[in-house]
């Protein structure tokens, strides 16, 4: 008579076979997305970009070079392109919002503009065309110790009575006392005061990251080519002289200020590890060792890769693409797996697993000619900045 263990073996074999077929732990690298040859992916990405650019410009085919004027681009066109490129670069330099930071309540702080009798204003020529607003960055850092904690920053101005409609523009003080355009506003006539608000989150983050002591804005009347009068007609509270006593105190309290919304420092410790991991992810994505879903570098040279000479600036750009498997949990004891099985039964050629797709995209400014006329365009969603599994 065989031992009891051998007698039970026929009964145990089906159970052992079931355990082999049914993993009890996540299949970390499992993905039903088909793997593709890297060179094939790059070629397909290049062809997709060719069609994408023509489609965004509403062109059926690349424009003819025609009689393009020789020499460099006109100065005005180049200045417009450079300002557009700088604005895009400034926006892309802003850190991505922290999902965990968004959970916490935000502390709101008001930082008043440096008063107009400060010597910093003496460095800028008084003009009927503009007003200047400067802020002490030490006060900003006291309110927001780290740039990543800043959720939103608004420049608030109290506009007094305005008799005529006026188009105004806001600029940021840049390096070498130059000014970078930020935004504009069309102000309608009004008999009552009104608060104006400009979103300057990215600018304040830059200030917090740099070591400067005083930073500022300029509000100017729109310089119209067909108008000789470019006087700033709007009266902003805090710049009118001749007030005394309590009225002057109230007037000074309502001078321009920055409204800051940030995660308090005592709640920030929890975010340190997640920020560190995300910073490492960026490095991993551009290394050859990372196999999972990540941003892969791809530089497009317009002449070499597309055979185009009609785009004058830039000569090329980093389009990038997303590639890599997306891990997910596969277990037969979940309802999700039953749905997947049913999905695969009815769609045998489809992928039920998450796939690597773009998450954040950036625009691309270009200069090109239509006949003899140069044009500056901003093409949306042309640069892959980050990827996700979806």
Curated annotation (Swiss-Prot):
Region (Bowtie tail): 226-252
GO process annotations (BP): adaptive immune response based on somatic recombination of immune receptors built from immunoglobulin superfamily domains; aortic valve morphogenesis; ATP biosynthetic process; branch elongation involved in mammary gland duct branching; bronchiole development; canonical Wnt signaling pathway; cell morphogenesis; cell-cell junction organization
Outcome of mutating residue 45 to C: In IBDIMDE; decreased TGFB1-mediated activation of SMAD signaling; reduced levels of secreted TGFB1
GO molecular function, one term: identical protein binding
Phenotype for residue 218 to C: In CAEND; higher levels of active TGF-beta-1 in the culture medium; enhances osteoclast formation in vitro
Amino-acid biosynthesis as UniProt keyword: no
Tissues in which the protein is found: Highly expressed in bone. Abundantly expressed in articular cartilage and chondrocytes and is increased in osteoarthritis (OA). Colocalizes with ASPN in chondrocytes within OA lesions of articular cartilage.
InterPro entries to which the protein is assigned, alphabetical: Cystine-knot_cytokine, TGF-b_C, TGF-b_propeptide, TGF-beta, TGF-beta-rel, TGFb1, TGFb_CS
Consequence of changing residue 237 to A: Does not affect integrin-binding or activation of TGF-beta-1
Annotated phenotype, changing residue 160 to A/R: Does not affect integrin-binding or activation of TGF-beta-1
Disulphides: 285-294, 293-356, 322-387, 326-389
Further remarks about this protein from its record: TGF-beta-1 is inactivated by fresolimumab (also named GC1008), a monoclonal-neutralizing antibody.
Subunit structure: Homodimer; disulfide-linked. Interacts with the serine proteases, HTRA1 and HTRA3: the interaction with either inhibits TGFB1-mediated signaling and the HTRA protease activity is required for this inhibition. May interact with THSD4; this interaction may lead to sequestration by FBN1 microfibril assembly and attenuation of TGFB signaling. Interacts with CD109, DPT and ASPN. Interacts with EFEMP2. Interacts with TSKU; the interaction contributes to regulation of the hair cycle.
Alphabetized PANTHER family for the sequence: TGF-BETA FAMILY, TRANSFORMING GROWTH FACTOR BETA-1 PROPROTEIN
Associated disease: Camurati-Engelmann disease: An autosomal dominant disorder characterized by hyperostosis and sclerosis of the diaphyses of long bones. The disease typically presents in early childhood with pain, muscular weakness and waddling gait, and in some cases other features such as exophthalmos, facial paralysis, hearing difficulties and loss of vision. Inflammatory bowel disease, immunodeficiency, and encephalopathy: An autosomal recessive disorder characterized by severe infantile inflammatory bowel disease manifesting as bloody diarrhea and failure to thrive, global developmental delay, epilepsy, brain atrophy and encephalopathy. Affected individuals suffer from recurrent infections associated with impaired T-cell response to stimulation and decreased T-cell subsets, including regulatory and helper T cells.
Protein name according to UniProt: Transforming growth factor beta-1 proprotein
Source species: Homo sapiens (Human)
Gene: TGFB1
């Amino acid at each position: 008579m065989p031992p009891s263990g051998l007698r039970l073996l026929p009964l145990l074999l089906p159970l052992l076979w079931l355990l082999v077929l049914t993993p009890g732990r996540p299949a970390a690298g499992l993905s039903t997305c088909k793997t593709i040859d890297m060179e094939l992916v790059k070629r397909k990405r290049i062809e997709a970009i060719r069609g994408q650019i023509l489609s965004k410009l509403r062109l059926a085919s690349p424009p003819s070079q025609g009689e393009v004027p020789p020499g460099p681009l006109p100065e005005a066109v180049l200045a417009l392109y450079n300002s557009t490129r700088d604005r895009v670069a400034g926006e892309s330099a802003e850190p991505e919002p922290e999902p965990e930071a968004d959970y916490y309540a935000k502390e709101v702080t008001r930082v008043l503009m440096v008063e107009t009798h400060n010597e910093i204003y003496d460095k800028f020529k008084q003009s009927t065309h503009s007003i200047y607003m400067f802020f002490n960055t030490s006060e900003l850092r006291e309110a927001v110790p780290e740039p990543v904690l800043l959720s939103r920053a608004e420049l608030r101005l109290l506009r007094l009575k305005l008799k005529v409609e006026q188009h105004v523009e806001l600029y940021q003080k840049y390096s070498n006392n130059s000014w970078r355009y930020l935004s504009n506003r069309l102000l309608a006539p009004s008999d009552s005061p009104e608060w104006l608000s400009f979103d300057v989150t990215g600018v304040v983050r830059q200030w917090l990251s740099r070591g400067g002591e005083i930073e500022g804005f300029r509000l100017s009347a729109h310089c119209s080519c067909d108008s000789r009068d470019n006087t700033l007609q709007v009266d902003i509270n805090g710049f009118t002289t001749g007030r005394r006593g309590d009225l002057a105190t109230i007037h000074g309290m309502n001078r321009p200020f920055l409204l800051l919304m940030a995660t308090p420092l005592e709640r920030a410790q929890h975010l340190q590890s997640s920020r560190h991991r995300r910073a490492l992810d960026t490095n991993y994505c551009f290394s050859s060792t990372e196999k999972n879903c990540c941003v892969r570098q791809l530089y497009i040279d317009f002449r070499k890769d597309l055979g185009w000479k009609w785009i004058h600036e830039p000569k090329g750009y980093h389009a990038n693409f997303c590639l890599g498997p997306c891990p997910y949990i596969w277990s037969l004891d979940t309802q999700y797996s039953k749905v997947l099985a049913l999905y695969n039964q009815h769609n045998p050629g489809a992928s039920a697993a998450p796939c690597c797709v773009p998450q954040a995209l950036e625009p691309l400014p270009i200069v090109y000619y239509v006949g003899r006329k140069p044009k500056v365009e901003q093409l949306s969603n042309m640069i892959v900045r980050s990827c996700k599994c979806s």
